[in-house]
């Protein structure tokens, strides 16, 4: 009996430890990073399942035009959601610095400042997004000329944009938890949200037959409910974070410090979205005949859309590693341990190599027999042409994932030491490279304007927009990585 009680006690302590924040300033560097990263990896994979459940259920239950419409909204949703995500991730660098320095008053003031800024950003983004839907759809060549695709895309954007608040504050809450070293609780909430979203998708799309609106509504409702639960957990579990009335007496210095970290990262992600919009607009051209009619089934859009979803899934582990290194570097810089910042960033690059081999290889395996398209599209939407377009994209992107992994580590490592202006510069570099490659290289290879009759080589040229953009950004980030992280030059911290 005593042995049984001992086992239960150990199990209880182990379960409790999962919910305890990790001190990123102590312990063996690579072990601490891995321990902190693994729940984030699982969280990001769940987040993709959360997104992919929409795609799979839509792909199996909606028409080809409706699926194409939903796929075409990806960069348009991305441009606002990623701005919000970038801002909240950047704001939390301040929180991590305060935690590393042991400044509890600073933690609460940072939390209060972030709440106010997130409310302001929500109002601004919702107003802009809701008023610009038709304009942005025109950017990606989705117009009333193809009414079924246009109607589906407009409806999806409208519902998602109306729920920006839920998505922004859910990202904010999970970023707060990770900034204090708790990467397990966001995983738990994402698990709950994934299951809930799949159930609501089935209910709204198959049960109520709400179509595209049902898919978007399920996502928004799920995130709203999980946001409330997540903030409730934060206020109950972490009493030191509860801001009081005095903490909301925010000065311009507090706002400026957070905006200095958040805005460049938010703008960087939005800038990336503009590049993706250009890439999508060029992809749509491969579905348009010389006379202006659309190819039946939209194979380029659906093939590329399915491939993009697989790419997003396979990049999750490397993206999660980048997310982890932000909090790791920020906490250790706050504690004044610059050598630990250097070792952590370098060891993260080694970890990234293992993740690259594993997940890029697995992604390539899923191209055999078009397996990935069978996940995201029903059989009637899969054709030799959709496979040709989708596989071409994957054969270019996946082998070059090592560049993307390097970008994730360097960009987030530099963000974690407070040099957010360099992350914005890298985003600008990505935009320039992607726009130049996507807008000019396909036409150059094709020997003229691109349309559904263009050569396969022209589409392959378009696919190089991704790795070309990643490489350009990495080249920019090598400077702050070498100057500040490797050479440990942190003199900028002491400048007034």
Residue map of PLM features:
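Short alpha-helical transmembrane segments in multi-pass integral membrane proteins
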Residues: 1-37, 95-163, 209-263, 329-400, ...
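Residue-level signal for short hydrophobic patches within transmembrane helices
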Residues: 26, 30-49, 53, 76-83, ...
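Transmembrane helical elements of multi-pass membrane transporters/channels
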Residues: 35-54, 159, 193, 222-226, ...
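Generic alpha-helical transmembrane segments of integral inner-membrane proteins
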Residues: 41, 45, 49, 53, ...
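Small-residue hotspots at the loop-to-helix junctions and early N-terminal turns
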Residues: 64-75, 153, 157, 216, ...
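Small-residue-rich hydrophobic transmembrane alpha-helices
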Residues: 67-127, 167-186, 301-364, 404-426
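Short runs within selected transmembrane alpha-helices of multi-pass transporters and secretion channels
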Residues: 85-88, 159-178, 186-194, 215-230, ...
């Amino acid at each position: 009996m005593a042995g049984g009680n001992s086992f239960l006690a150990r199990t209880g302590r182990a379960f409790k430890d999962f919910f305890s924040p990790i001190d990123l300033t102590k312990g063996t560097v690579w072990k601490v990073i891995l321990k902190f990263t693994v729940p984030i990896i699982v969280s990001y994979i769940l987040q993709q399942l959360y997104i992919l459940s929409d795609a799979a259920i839509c792909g199996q239950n909606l028409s080809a035009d409706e699926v194409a419409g939903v796929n075409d909204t990806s960069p348009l949703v991305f441009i606002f959601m990623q701005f919000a995500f970038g801002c909240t991730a950047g704001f939390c660098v301040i929180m991590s610095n305060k935690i590393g320095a042991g400044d509890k008053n600073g933690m609460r003031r940072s939390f209060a400042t972030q709440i106010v800024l997130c409310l302001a950003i929500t109002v601004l983004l919702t107003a802009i997004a809701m008023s610009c839907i038709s304009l942005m759809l025109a950017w990606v060549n989705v117009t009333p000329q193809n009414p079924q695709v246009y109607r589906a895309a407009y409806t999806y954007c409208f519902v998602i944009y109306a729920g920006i608040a839920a998505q922004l504050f859910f990202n904010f809450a999970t970023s707060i938890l990770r900034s204090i070293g708790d990467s397990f609780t966001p995983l738990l909430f994402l698990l709950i949200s994934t299951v809930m979203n799949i159930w609501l998708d089935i209910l709204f799309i198959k049960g109520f037959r709400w179509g595209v609106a049902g898919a978007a509504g399920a996502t928004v409702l799920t995130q709203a409910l999980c946001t409330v639960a997540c903030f409730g957990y934060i206020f109950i579990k972490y009493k030191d974070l509860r801001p009081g009335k005095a903490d909301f007496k925010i000065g311009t210095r507090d706002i400026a410090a957070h905006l200095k970290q958040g805005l460049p990262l938010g703008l960087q992600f939005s800038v990336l979205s503009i590049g993706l919009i250009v890439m999508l607009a060029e992809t749509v051209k491969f579905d348009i005949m010389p006379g202006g009619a659309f190819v039946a089934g939209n194979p380029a859009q659906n093939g590329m859309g399915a491939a993009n979803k697989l790419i997003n899934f396979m990049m999750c582990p490397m993206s999660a590693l980048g997310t982890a290194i932000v909090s790791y570097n920020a906490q250790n810089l706050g504690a004044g341990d610059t050598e630990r910042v250097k070792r952590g960033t370098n060891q993260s690059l080694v970890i990234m190599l293992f993740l690259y081999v594993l997940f890029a290889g697995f992604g390539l395996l899923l191209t055999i027999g078009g397996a990935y398209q069978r996940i995201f599209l029903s059989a009637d939407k899969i054709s030799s042409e959709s496979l040709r377009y989708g596989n071409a994209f994957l054969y270019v992107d996946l082998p070059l994932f090592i560049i993307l992994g390097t970008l994730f580590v360097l960009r987030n490592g530099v963000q974690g030491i407070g040099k957010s202006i360099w992350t914005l510069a890298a985003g600008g570099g990505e935009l320039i490279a992607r726009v130049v490659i996507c807008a000019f290289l396909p036409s150059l290879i094709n020997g003229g304007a691109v349309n559904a009759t263009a050569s396969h080589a022209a589409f392959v040229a378009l696919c190089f927009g991704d790795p070309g953009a990643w490489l350009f950004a990495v080249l920019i980030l090598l400077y702050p990585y070498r100057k500040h992280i490797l050479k440990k030059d942190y003199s900028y911290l002491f400048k007034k």
